[in-house]
A protein has these predicted regions:
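N-terminal targeting signals for export/organelle localization
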Residues: 1-33, 184-189
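A short beta-strand-turn-helix
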Residues: 30-51, 75
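Short active-site neighborhood of thiol/selenol oxidoreductases, capturing the structured segment around
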Residues: 44-67, 71
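Solvent-exposed coil/turn segments that connect beta secondary-structure elements
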Residues: 57-58, 90-95, 120, 160-163, ...
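Structural microenvironment flanking redox-active thiols in thiol-disulfide oxidoreductases
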Residues: 68-126
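Thiol/disulfide oxidoreductase modules built on the thioredoxin-like
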Residues: 122-180
Length: 189
């Protein structure tokens, strides 16, 4: 993805009002092939054509569980509406979110939903593709386990060509996303 496209996406994500904003991007933002490969590996179930991506961490007590519940709801609705949509939860906290922890965390979400655990520069590059930031509070050499993380609750819908097409708040805009799945079948064809 070009620096301009990344910058515009980051501006869109960061400039969104506190209350939700469901946005269909007029110019879809293409993801790098490496990012697309990672998403495909995270959700190999019958290779859904569309991907719904949310970022978070398993020790989050309020925002992430609701985001994941909404992700699961949308994936199930997409199945009912005959839209091939897979969900991917991307951990922003790989130090505490091991594969075992993430597997347990995402298993109740059902089929067509997986997780992605990346570390270091690979995670930073992946988050950068989406304009997502994560801020760690009180994480230091003396406190490597009991810290907080602040991150975006933005959800991203990636089309079969590997482009970000929809951006919305995973907490505030799930109703708009459900309406889009029910009423705009042509969009997903």
């Amino acid at each position: 993805m070009s620096g301009f496209a990344t910058g515009m996406l980051a501006l869109l994500v960061l400039a969104s009002p506190a209350r939700g904003a469901f946005v269909t991007l007029p110019s879809p933002v293409p993801l790098a092939e490496k990012s697309l490969d990672l998403l495909r590996k995270a959700n190999p179930a019958d290779a859904p054509q569309w991907q719904l991506v949310v970022f978070g961490f398993t020790r989050c007590e309020d925002i992430c569980p609701r985001s994941l519940e909404n992700l699961s709801r949308l994936v199930k609705l997409a199945r009912e509406e005959k839209v091939g949509l897979g969900g991917v939860f991307v951990s922003v906290d790989p130090d505490r979110d091991t594969d075992i922890v993430l597997e347990r965390y995402t298993a109740p979400l059902g089929e067509n939903t997986g997780y992605l655990r990346l570390e270091g520069e690979e995670l930073e590059r992946f988050k950068g593709q989406f304009g997502v930031e994560a801020v760690f509070y009180n994480k230091n050499k003396g406190n490597e386990f009991f810290y907080q993380v602040d991150h975006s609750s933005t959800a991203f819908v990636i089309d079969p060509a590997g482009r970000i097409r929809l951006v919305f708040d995973a907490l505030e805009d799930v109703g708009s996303a459900e309406k889009m799945l029910r009423d705009n079948q042509d969009f997903f064809q």
